[in-house]
Amino acid sequence: RESASENEITKHYLLENSEKYGVKQSQNLYPVMNEKNILNEKIRISRELEKLKKIKQKELTKKQQNTYMILMDYLKRQKNLSMYPYYERILGKTSGQQVQILLTLSEYRLKNEKDIKSYFRLLQGLDGYFNSLIQYSKEQVKRNLFISDQSLRGVLQQIQSVIKRNKNNILVATFNLRMAEIKGINASQKKRYCRKNKKLVRTKVIPAYEKLYSHLQALKGNGQNKNGLYYYKNGKEYYKALVA
């Protein structure tokens, strides 16, 4: 329940009718990547591990024991990774957060007007999410953990391609298709929603990408390591935790 309520994106992905499970409205639209949240996540993982350790395995069924072992293994991995909070590669030409969020939004479940309004809030809040990516990247620069210029060029090229395709953005095309499949909303209202989506992409999404591009371009020259995660300070230990 705690994981599902962390942000709107996660809640919507995990639960279709979150109210039935007692999950309240999320305060955050997106995952927040800042020092406070990183610390809170460390604390949460430690607490979950302590709770799990108190469970008597002998009293569990075979199926429950399997679930227990999987969860224990997962939490231990996450605890190890939490020791390296600024090593994560959040930016990438094909797998970075700036790419993944477009795919997530383009596949956002739309079954009713509540879902549509939630989706619109996410478009309006994209700039805030990108601000957290910018701040995270600046923290990586301070710690000499920022991506190389070669990798950054790929990221900037991808962002530029999104900006250039502002009129035929993936969020416009996929939204129109999903709207056509929704039942219980009349045709005129669907058209209004499609127009609003197009406007939000133009006035909120594209400017958010333009701002991200500008800030990341300013960080060019700060990536000291061209040889991968292993070659950062403590990179060997981080890589072991990552692939364990």
Task: Identify the residue ranges that each predicted region occupies.
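N-terminal maturation segment of proteins
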Residues: 1-244
